[in-house]
Amino acid sequence: LVPGHDAIVHYAAESHNDNSIADPEPFLRTNVEGTFRLLEAVRKYGVRYHHVSTDEVYGDLALDDPAKFTEETPYKPSSPYSSTKASSDMLVRAWTRTYGLRTTISNCSNNYGPYQHVEKFIPRQITNIIDGVRPKLYGKGENVRDWIHTEDHSSSVWDILTKGRTGETYLIGANGENNNITVLRMILEAMGRDPEDFDWVADRPGHDRRYAIDSMKL
């Protein structure tokens, strides 16, 4: 698929944290080995390459911390998923320096939008409500995510692909910080349900507290 194309944009990934905790091996195969194979293909054919990654490679921030992630924030992944994405980012940087590939990297906040996989937070809650199942919320629902619509994400990726500097990393966010309980209650109210009509469940291991993006570089 690589020969004859202007660029490769690598969106593909295993990306659900719960699944990575239950079975990390597919994440290693897809996110690390898959990236390696694409890098070798673009090295062979000299094609421009953009690598789509996640802000989760930076770990998390305290709920009361006013700071945001920047391109200079040290990597500190805290889950099997985020560690494989951090590894794939490092592969891109190494292949860029060693082989002179024309690459860029973007680390984006949490996406939402049409046709998103049902394993993700927003479509899972919507699907549960439609199916008559009470939504479930981890911990105290205090975990904060910086939400961005998929169209805004893709628009930013296009800008990086067409205007970005080779070897650079760009953070993509939308200043859309909300904690999980707020998002769930918004969904319940939008669907005509009682905003308290959900169940609390035990928090997952290593659940990141807060993500926040400083995307001023874009």
Go through the PLM ranges and name each one:
Residues 19-20, 72-76, 101-114, 125-148, ...:
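A conserved pocket-lining segment of Rossmann-fold NAD(P)-dependent short-chain dehydrogenase/reductase
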Residues 129-218:
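C-terminal substrate-binding subdomain of Rossmann-fold SDR/epimerase-dehydratase oxidoreductases
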Residues 1-29:
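NAD(P)H-binding glycine-rich loop region in Rossmannoid oxidoreductase-like domains
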Residues 7-10, 36-80:
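Conserved Rossmann-fold NAD(P)-dependent oxidoreductase catalytic core, especially the SDR/UDP-sugar
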Residues 35-36, 86-93, 123-126, 154-155:
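Conserved active-site helix of classical SDR/Rossmann-fold NAD(P)-dependent CH-OH oxidoreductases
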Residues 18-26, 60-67, 117-118, 140:
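Conserved catalytic-core motifs of eukaryotic protein kinase domains, centered on the activation segment
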Residues 60-63, 76-104, 129-131:
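Active-site Tyr-X1-5-Lys
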